[in-house]
């Protein structure tokens, strides 16, 4: 879905005001299934500081907490928010706190309220998705972590080559603590979920797969995600319970992978 200031543009699905966004999200929620992923990209302008920072819309603007409330019904879906606006940090922090939970990722183009100029982050983020330029591991997919790192690294190079002091520093939160890591990496607080969250088109590697192998591949991806989420919540479990659940998931993943491989030879 694409939201804009008017309906004059045929590419626009609805006007970018609270009513238009809310109605469109309600319709979208009815068409989504449990386990689906929704990616939301904020392109435009932001104003204000700290958690009172707002995303500029047609009509009343919204704070991060108010924006998060529009997604209250998406309890069974994974949510990704990429905020590329000016004054994005305060808005993103409030948003991250409000929607905190499993399967939630928030990217902010800036790391502090003092970084309030229009960021270059969106330019390179979109570039990373174009022709899968950010696909560092060459698996024909672009994960959110790959797109984030591509944009972040290119922004840094842009300022260095321009001889200017960097006016923006992007951050990512995917563990629900609303603290944005500047260098997220799997196993280091933030980055594990973003590594397996893909935001490009369907996997080119799925072309030609039978219905059975496609279903098995999707199950493998679901199990891999469950393992990562469980590892991230280890501190919430008793030692024996944690290892029992992890063992169950890993055995299921191994069996599914074996079946996927066996189907290829038949």
Regions found by a protein language model. Name each.
Residues 1-266:
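Cysteine endopeptidase catalytic domains of the caspase/legumain-like
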């Amino acid at each position: 879905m694409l939201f804009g200031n008017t309906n004059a543009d045929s590419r626009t699905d609805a006007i970018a005001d609270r009513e238009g966004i809310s109605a469109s999200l309600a319709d979208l929620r009815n068409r989504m299934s449990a386990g689906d992923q929704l990616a939301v990209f904020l392109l435009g302008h932001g104003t204000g500081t700290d958690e009172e920072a707002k995303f500029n819309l047609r009509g009343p603007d919204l704070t991060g907490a108010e924006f998060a409330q529009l997604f209250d019904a998406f309890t069974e879906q994974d949510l990704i928010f990429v905020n590329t606006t000016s004054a994005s940090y305060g808005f993103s922090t409030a948003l991250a706190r409000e929607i905190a939970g499993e399967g939630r990722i928030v990217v902010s183009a800036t790391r502090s309220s003092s970084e309030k100029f229009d960021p270059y982050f969106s330019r390179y983020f979109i570039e990373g998705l174009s022709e899968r330029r950010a696909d560092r591991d060459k698996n024909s997919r672009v994960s959110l972590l790959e797109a984030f790192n591509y944009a972040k690294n290119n922004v840094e190079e842009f300022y260095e080559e321009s001889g200017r002091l960097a006016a923006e520093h992007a951050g990512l939160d995917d563990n629900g603590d609303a603290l944005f890591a500047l260098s997220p990496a799997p196993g280091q607080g933030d980055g594990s979920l973003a590594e397996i969250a893909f935001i490009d088109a369907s996997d080119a590697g799925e072309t030609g797969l039978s219905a059975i192998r496609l279903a098995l591949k999707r199950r493998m991806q679901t199990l891999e995600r469950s393992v990562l989420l469980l590892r991230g919540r280890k501190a919430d479990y008793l030692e024996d319970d944690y290892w029992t659940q992890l063992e169950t998931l890993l055995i299921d993943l191994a069996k599914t992978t074996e079946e996927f491989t066996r189907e290829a030879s038949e």
